């Protein structure tokens, strides 16, 4: 039995993994696949790939490309979701900001540096024509940290997946003032180089199951 650990955010995108695990489809192929939730997002998963805490990650395209370029010993083996990810731009419900163009000098809540919330804030700033070097960030760890930072006034806006944050918009915690879709496929599957070298066929089996 081969042990493999897969990382992903606890969001609807990864429901197929929960279903295939529940159905014991990996065990039937002599693979003990374990799922690990990463509420901290892509930055946390990139770190986990580096340390060997996980073997496979369902990770944001922009996050893993940046980290591989910075030395992460992993490879992208396939696209997981081809459509763009829609990043909502959120402020506190009581904020004076009314549109995303107002946010040039505002403090941005991010889960961590190198995360999707960090990189997409840069993409949004670039699209708005702002000076990237002058962006101000507040590291908050995860979605709950973003909620707390906006409610407590520690940051001015927070970018997170549109539909994941919709309940917080609906109940009046956040106010969404814009969206910023990624100009690339949103999620890819990344695997540590060591795992590809030693368990390539098992990785192929995992991908075949999740793609079916």
Where are these regions (language model features)?
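Short, glycine-/small- and polar/acidic-enriched structural segments
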Residues: 2-130, 137-140, 156-162, 175-181
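Short, surface-exposed acidic
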Residues: 132-135, 200-201
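Pocket-lining segment of extracytoplasmic ligand-binding domains
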Residues: 144-212
């Amino acid at each position: 039995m081969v042990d493999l650990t897969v990382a992903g955010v606890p969001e609807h995108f990864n429901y197929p993994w929960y279903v295939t695990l529940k159905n014991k489809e990996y065990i039937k192929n002599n693979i003990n696949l374990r799922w690990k939730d990463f509420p901290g997002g892509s930055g946390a998963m990139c770190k986990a790939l580096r340390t060997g805490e996980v073997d496979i990650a369902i990770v944001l395209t922009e996050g893993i490309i940046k980290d591989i370029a910075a030395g992460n010993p992993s490879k992208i083996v396939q696209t997981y979701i081809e459509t763009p990810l829609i990043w909502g731009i959120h402020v506190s419900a009581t904020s004076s900001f009314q549109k995303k163009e107002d946010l040039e000098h505002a403090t941005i809540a991010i889960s961590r540096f190198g995360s999707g919330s960090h990189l997409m804030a840069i993409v949004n700033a670039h699209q708005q024509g702002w000076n990237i070097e002058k962006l101000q960030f507040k590291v908050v760890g995860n979605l709950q940290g973003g909620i707390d930072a906006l409610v407590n006034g520690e940051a001015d806006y927070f970018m997170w997946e549109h539909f994941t944050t919709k309940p917080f918009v609906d109940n009046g915690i956040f106010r969404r003032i814009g969206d910023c879709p990624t100009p690339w496929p949103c999620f890819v599957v990344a695997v540590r180089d060591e795992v590809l070298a030693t368990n390539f066929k098992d990785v192929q089996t995992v991908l075949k199951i999740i793609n079916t």
